[in-house]
Regions:
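Carbohydrate-interacting regions of secretory-pathway proteins
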Residues: 1-238
Length: 238
């Protein structure tokens, strides 16, 4: 019997995938038009000091999924933060107070544009990109970049192993440039990969956890920044 290596990673191979973004419009997406637009084949989210957003989300309404492989490219210009939501819900009351400046700019919070659930984090910061974040829940950061974590919903979390040095892995994240991001969700297992490098793994064994429910995809815009996302593809299993 001969041992063989797996086929090499080909980020541009979309066999078995469906596209969530047509490259020209926000068809299927739902968000505050003050912050979201399409430009040069990419979804652009932008918040400025004169147009602050706090947390706001562009929600993909045309698909819900539980088990899938998601691929996309993401770039941030500026100091704010972002992430890609998955298995997420809308309409849930927001836990963190919204600043008066944001309310003055946007009006009362529209919970249809606020997402609760798992997030693949992406920041220009060397700390957060690649980690597993549970948005708008008490769990928050569950698996930091470089960690393999086992959890049971919001009751417990335990470090099971290390993928690598958090700072060293962060040096693989490109600032002001495109990054390839892959998210794999199978049952209670979540895998985040950036630029071909494993960044974080979470195993959530609580079947009732908000992490383990089917839900929506979406993009977060947080703080003052410019965010670009393109080439969004999903291979949905269920």
């Amino acid at each position: 019997m001969q041992f063989t290596e797996p086929d090499p990673l080909d980020f541009s191979n979309h066999d078995g995938y469906v596209s969530l973004f047509d490259g020209a419009s926000l068809k299927g997406w739902d968000g505050n038009p003050k912050f979201w637009r399409v430009e040069d084949g990419a979804i652009v989210g932008e918040a400025t000091p004169k147009n602050p957003c706090g947390n706001t989300y562009l929600v993909y309404r045309d698909m819900k999924a539980k088990d899938f492989t998601l691929k996309f490219e993401m770039k941030i210009v500026g100091s704010g933060g972002s992430g890609f939501q998955y298995r997420s819900q809308t309409g849930i009351p927001w836990l963190v107070p919204i600043s008066p400046a944001v309310i003055s700019n946007t009006g009362p919070v529209n919970l249809d544009w606020m997402m609760t659930g798992p997030q693949a984090d992406f920041w220009p910061s060397q700390i957060y990109s690649g980690q597993f974040y549970s948005e708008n829940t008490p769990m928050r950061i569950i698996a930091w970049r470089g960690q393999v974590v086992e959890s049971f919903g919001d009751d417990s979390k335990r470090l099971m192993g290390a993928i690598g040095d958090r700072k060293g892995l962060g040096e693989l994240v490109k600032n002001d440039d495109w990054n390839q991001y892959t998210v794999i969700a199978r049952g209670g297992t979540f895998i985040h990969i950036m630029n071909g490098q494993l960044m974080a793994v979470l195993v959530d064994d609580d079947p009732n956890s908000s992490n383990n429910q089917p839900g929506l995809f979406g993009i977060e815009l947080e703080s003052i920044t410019q965010l670009y996302v393109r080439n969004i593809w999903v291979k949905k299993l269920n």
